[in-house]
Every structure is written in C-alpha cells, then in structure tokens.
C-alpha cells in the first residue's frame, strides 16, 4: 500500500548577472543545488543581444554535457534550474528554464514551487486562445505576462505575480535584466549574493552562493521581487498582502545543512530539533543512530542531549545508480537495502534509538527497522525530528494526496506496530517551532507547517474540492480540535 519513496523537493533556481563566465558559474551553482532536483537541468544565457539555452534529462552532469557548455560560453548573464517534477510530466518539454522568443523580446524563465491555481488560470488562458507547449505550471505566468496591458515588462510581471497563488520563487532573464520573485508567504526561499568583482547572484539556497566564494547580501522576503541590471540591484514589493510562512520542510529535510534560511543555519536547526525531541521523548538505550543524510544533525543533537554515544550504525551508498529506483515492486523492495547498509558490528545486541527526519509513507523506515533487527539489534526505538506528517502539501513537495500519508489514517501506536519499532515518538509542533527559532509576527512564528496542521497559508484554490472530499477521519478529528489561522484562500482568520 505504501510504496518506497522519499520526499522530493521539485526544483532549485540560480541566476547570475554580469560575469564573463556566467554559464560556467551557473553550472557550479546548480551542482550545489542538485539535491533539490535530479530529473533534469537547464541553463539560459544572455549577452544583452540574444538569449539561448541548453537543457536535458537526468542529473546535471547527464543533462548538460561539455559540448552544450561550450555553446553557452561568451555570455555574461544566465539563469539555471534543476528539476524534480511535482507539476507536469517528466518529459524534456518540461525541463526549465523555458526560453521564449517574441517579436519584441526574448525571455528565459524558471520556477521553484507549485502554483495552486495554475489549472484554473490555464483553462481561462486557453479559452482566450493561449497555446501551451508543456504541462508545467511555470508556463502559465509567461502567458499572463504577455497578455498584460501594462506598459513595461516589470509592470506586467508585477501584475502577473499578483494573479498566481501558491508557494514559489521565479528567476527570469531578459537581455536587460535578471529578475527574481518570491510568493506572498515566502514559502520557498530565494537569496541574493555578491561576488568580489560586483557580480550579483540569485539562488534557492545560500550554499550556491558560498560555493562561488560570494557574500550573502539578503533574503528576498514575502511578496518581494528583485531587479538586477547594469545599474545595480533593486528590491521591491509586488503586493503588501503578505504573511510570512517559510516552509518548515526546508529546515527539516530539503535544504543542505550548510545553507542558511532567514538567518537560521539548517544544521543548527536540525541539531536543536534533535535536542528538543530528546527532552520531549527520552528513552533508555545504548546508542543513537541517524538515518543518512538529512537526519544526522538531529541524531547528534538527540545523543548530545540524552548523554548517549552517537554511532554510525547505518551507512549510505552515495553512488547508487538512479536506475535502482524503479517502478516495480521487486526493485522497490531492494531499494532501501541498496541505498543503506546496517553496520552489524555496531548494532548487534544493542538497544538503539533511531532518529529520522519524518515519516511520510512509512515504507522506508519500516525496512530500516527490519534491517537493523536483521543485523542483530535488540530493540529499535524510533524518534522523528518533526511532527506527524498528516496532511498533503500543495506548495512544491511531491505529496499532494491524503492516500500517500500513513499518519492520515494510522495513529502513532498503529504506525509503531506497522514499522516494527519498539517505541515511536514525534517532535511536537511547538517543539519544532521553538527549535527553528523564527520570530516573525505571524502564525507559527513565521513557519509554514501545513503538512503537520492542515493549515494552508497560501490557501487551497484548485486543490480544495479534492482535498476536502478525501479527508480521513483522523484528519477531520485533528482539524476539529486545533485552531486554524488561514482560510481556504490563505486569508488570516479574524
């Protein structure tokens, strides 16, 4: 019932303005964002006369080869994208950046996140005669921009950004400027960096700035867009109807541990969440083990707080071929064992605390528990460094249906039995908020915790009817007992 699959973030975006090796630096930036998308990659370049691009399927090294990079040399400006599909199919027609050539201008555009009203916008645009060349929701905003009556591209962009809903960041390139934009809740991150020679960089995470030796300049905040051109950099607002709600899953799972989001280092946050989890749910054992890689920081925090040794009881194969993750049951059954190995000499005869970042479908953690016990572990106590993942996400994570979520239908006690653990406990929502430590004057201190609370800061829009029709009894119980701050259109409940 619950297939082997981890969570997947769908995209990473990168942009650079005014560097003689723009394409090469974009490639390096995308490489540092590879964890955000492995299904395809692309780069669009500009020299203020023309725009051209290259793209392909697979990891960055597969998608863009040396010959393609050679064709991108000599241009000063660029945007790039790594993709994991949450909207649209996996064909090359959906690999970004998209490049459009119009009679009066050319535009490259790429996007991270999910537009939750893309379906209805697309239907309206098609009724007006718009022709779409992909199934990606990114294409919607380009049609909105071109149909705008605004006098300038920037004004048309602002107008279009006010029409799309969801969690998103955009990187857009014309011959005159590099643009970046963030949704009205800042659900998805976007940062600006500056190199020593004055070159400006846009990126989904600060790790892409650091890898180029650039300095962090600022976060782009909720409802803001940035314009970078030969005159410098300008940050403006396209809407003042904003409520900061940064995705908690960026801290918990998606972002690289060396990245910083809204002033909070990801590794430090994860370690703090592990410490808080140990305070909330201690248990007697011989050692603490983390599930590689995103859970290692939390596991070290748990071990430090509880005063137990932190051991490497699981080893991850960093070089698993992508062909191992196949849509057949037989290969799925082998998936965890190929990716992870238990260290028998470490775990044999021991009582173990196993720390993981989340339980979504339950299949992966079930097989890890079995693997540890098959290797001689006496007891395995599972501790999860986030709350119960009970509600689907519509803002750019590939879990958009209740049926995929084991916590939507099973209690922690039932999940404990299903995964074969000796005990199971989760970090509380309040514990998560405290661990991350944001201090915005907003619900949940400025975090988006929709998957744990069913409270959707950007609303539901096209997803509302199906979401409500498939709510489980357990989800309905949670909603009835807990305050919600946002209505179905993302407005604050007064």
UniProtKB/Swiss-Prot annotation:
Pathway given in the UniProt record: Purine metabolism; IMP biosynthesis via de novo pathway; N(1)-(5-phospho-D-ribosyl)glycinamide from 5-phospho-alpha-D-ribose 1-diphosphate: step 1/2
Function per UniProt: Catalyzes the formation of phosphoribosylamine from phosphoribosylpyrophosphate (PRPP) and glutamine.
EC number: 2.4.2.14
Protein name: Amidophosphoribosyltransferase
Cofactor(s) required, per the database record: Mg(2+)
PROSITE patterns recorded: GATASE_TYPE_2, PUR_PYR_PR_TRANSFER
List of catalytic residues: 11 (nucleophile)
SUPFAM superfamilies noted in UniProt: N-terminal nucleophile aminohydrolases (Ntn hydrolases), PRTase-like
InterPro entries reported in the protein's UniProt record: GATase_2_dom, Ntn_hydrolases_N, PRibTrfase_dom, PRTase-like, PurF, PurF_N
Chain sites annotated for binding Mg(2+): 294, 356-357
Domain named Glutamine amidotransferase type-2: residues: 11-231
NCBIfam families for the chain: purF (TIGR01134)
GO biological process assignments: 'de novo' IMP biosynthetic process; purine nucleobase biosynthetic process
Molecular function GO labels: amidophosphoribosyltransferase activity; magnesium ion binding
Record propeptide residues: 1-10
Short name of one Pfam family: GATase_7
Keywords from the UniProt entry: Glutamine amidotransferase, Glycosyltransferase, Magnesium, Metal-binding, Purine biosynthesis, Transferase
HAMAP family per UniProt: PurF
Catalytic activity as recorded in UniProt: 5-phospho-beta-D-ribosylamine + L-glutamate + diphosphate = 5-phospho-alpha-D-ribose 1-diphosphate + L-glutamine + H2O
Cofactor binding comment, as recorded: Binds 1 Mg(2+) ion per subunit.
Family listed: In the C-terminal section; belongs to the purine/pyrimidine phosphoribosyltransferase family.
Database matches in CDD domains: GPATase_N (cd00715), PRTases_typeI (cd06223)
